[in-house]
């Protein structure tokens, strides 16, 4: 069968010299050249320089009579056959669809040998007992397998794309966190440098003052000592002179002179006053607050860099009807007026509590609860297991999946198996809750003074959720990271 290149070569041979396209209704003129009837008719209608001259052939320039061109039916058939060959080539019915051995079109598929056969091949002895099917029938089950494979592959590709998207988002979040921590470190150390410069100025000013006091007291000491030396030198000179005189002159007023010398007391001057010396000795103690500030700064910075701020919000689907939530779900206030809330399975119906919108399944997280208690009010903060009891009485203890502390009017209690009242330096108004899921620590600290409040130890295997309880009209709390 003709190849695609051969068909193209044949098609070039039956092109019209005028329009360069395939000949349509080919006609022959006197010189033997062929043209499309329409092309040659339009060519003859173009007037020449001499209206009396006959038109000439576009190829060889031989004159011909306008009415002398004849239809070339044989050439028209050739053109039609070539166009059919082109169509076959375009549809892909080329050499690959023809048996190389017999030149016949391939119709069958031998399932035993997995070979494509023509009619002659099928009748051959080697395939006589084999299972034969038409090509489309044989391809059908394979197409079905391909569709199944495509479905699986597309699903796996989608899963990989989802993983890629999720991990890209996670990496972007991590990059944002790193950038935030970088800015935090820069900001904290800028404040530290400012604080250190201020403290340096204060301490240097104190040292400068002490330096001035020492120099002033030195001048006073030198002046006092010089006066004493001068007076003692005068007495010594007077006695030496008296001693050199004759006896009669020596005895004149000798008693008053001796009394005056004997009663003369030497003042023992002190170069540096005890008070100034004590100030100098106490100076290192004045730097202790600076050392404490440095220690607290480093502890605070390391803690904040070590724990991931949890950007949490309150879940209105879990809040007790007596809790009023703000529009941004960052604040809750107690009210004796019940809200019109649907009684869904997630909502607390007796304990005036609310959970955060999202839970935690790993990592180290921290958040701050700012508490404003009315007289007689209380606020409970901590974490609970995701399957904590929502209906009926809620027992606040670790055995029930609750790890929390309660801040009441005037005292703080750790809600362990048995509530324990804690002794603190001051009543916290801001409590930092820090969760280390893998280690199993729930730590509470005063967010302002960083005084430790209490730490629970547990073994977490399920999701835990930040937990908040509130009681007392006018009492409220708000969240921050």
From Swiss-Prot:
Zn(2+) binds at residues 99, 102, 121, 127. Residues 150-177 form a coiled coil. Keywords: Coiled coil, Cytoplasm, Metal-binding, Zinc, Zinc-finger. One of its GO terms (biological process) is host-mediated suppression of symbiont invasion. InterPro entries: B30.2/SPRY, B30.2/SPRY_sf, Butyrophylin_SPRY, ConA-like_dom_sf, PRY, SPRY_dom, TRIM/RBCC, TRIM10_RING-HC. Its main location: cytoplasm. Signal peptide: none annotated. GO terms for molecular function: ubiquitin protein ligase activity; zinc ion binding. It holds the Pfam family zf-B_box. It comes from the Eukaryota. The keyword Coiled coil applies. Belongs to the TRIM/RBCC family. PANTHER family: E3 UBIQUITIN-PROTEIN LIGASE TRIM. Interacts with IFNAR1; this interaction prevents association of IFNAR1 with TYK2. This is Tripartite motif-containing protein 10. It comes from Homo sapiens.
């Amino acid at each position: 069968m003709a190849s695609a290149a051969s068909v193209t070569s044949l098609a070039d041979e039956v092109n019209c010299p005028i329009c360069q396209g395939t000949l349509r209704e080919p006609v022959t003129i006197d010189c033997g050249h062929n043209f499309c009837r329409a092309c040659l008719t339009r060519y003859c209608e173009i007037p020449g320089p001499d209206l009396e001259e006959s038109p000439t052939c576009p190829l060889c320039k031989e004159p011909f009579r306008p009415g002398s061109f004849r239809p070339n039916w044989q050439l028209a058939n050739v053109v039609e056959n070539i166009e059919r060959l082109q169509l076959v080539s375009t549809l892909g019915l080329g050499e690959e669809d023809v048996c190389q051995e017999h030149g016949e079109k391939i119709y069958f598929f031998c399932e035993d040998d997995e070979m494509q056969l023509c009619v002659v091949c099928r009748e051959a002895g080697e395939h006589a007992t084999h299972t034969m099917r038409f090509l489309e029938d044989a391809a059908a089950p394979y197409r079905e397998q391909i569709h199944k494979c495509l479905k699986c592959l597309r699903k796996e590709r989608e899963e990989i794309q989802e993983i890629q998207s999720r991990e890209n988002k996670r990496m972007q979040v991590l990059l944002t966190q790193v950038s935030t921590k970088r800015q935090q470190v820069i900001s904290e150390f800028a404040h530290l440098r400012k604080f250190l410069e201020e403290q340096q100025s204060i301490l240097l000013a104190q040292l400068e003052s002490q330096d001035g006091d020492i120099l002033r007291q030195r001048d006073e000491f030198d002046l006092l000592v010089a006066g004493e030396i001068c007076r003692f030198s005068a007495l010594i000179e007077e006695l030496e002179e008296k001693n050199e005189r004759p006896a009669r002159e020596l005895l004149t007023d000798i008693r008053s002179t001796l009394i005056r010398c004997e009663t003369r007391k030497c003042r023992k001057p002190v170069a540096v006053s005890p008070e100034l010396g004590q100030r100098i000795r106490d100076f290192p103690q004045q730097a202790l607050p600076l050392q404490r500030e440095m220690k607290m700064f480093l502890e605070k910075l390391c803690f904040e860099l070590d724990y991931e701020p949890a950007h949490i919000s309150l879940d209105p689907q879990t809040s007790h009807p007596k809790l009023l939530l703000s529009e941004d779900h960052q604040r809750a206030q107690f009210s004796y007026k019940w809200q019109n809330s649907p009684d869904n399975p997630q909502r607390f119906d007796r304990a005036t509590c609310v959970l955060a919108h999202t839970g935690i399944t790993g990592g180290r997280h921290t958040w701050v609860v700012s508490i404003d208690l009315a007289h007689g009010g209380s606020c409970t903060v901590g974490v609970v297991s995701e399957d904590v009891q929502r209906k009926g009485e809620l027992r606040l203890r670790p055995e029930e999946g609750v790890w929390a502390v309660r801040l009441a009017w005037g005292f703080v209690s750790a809600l362990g198996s048995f509530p324990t009242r804690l002794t603190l330096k001051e009543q916290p108004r801001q409590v930092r809750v820090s969760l280390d899921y893998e280690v199993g620590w729930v730590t509470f600290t005063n967010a302002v003074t960083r005084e430790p409040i209490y730490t629970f130890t547990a073994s977490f295997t399920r999701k835990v959720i930040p937990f908040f309880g509130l009681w007392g009209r006018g009492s409220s709390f708000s969240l921050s990271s």
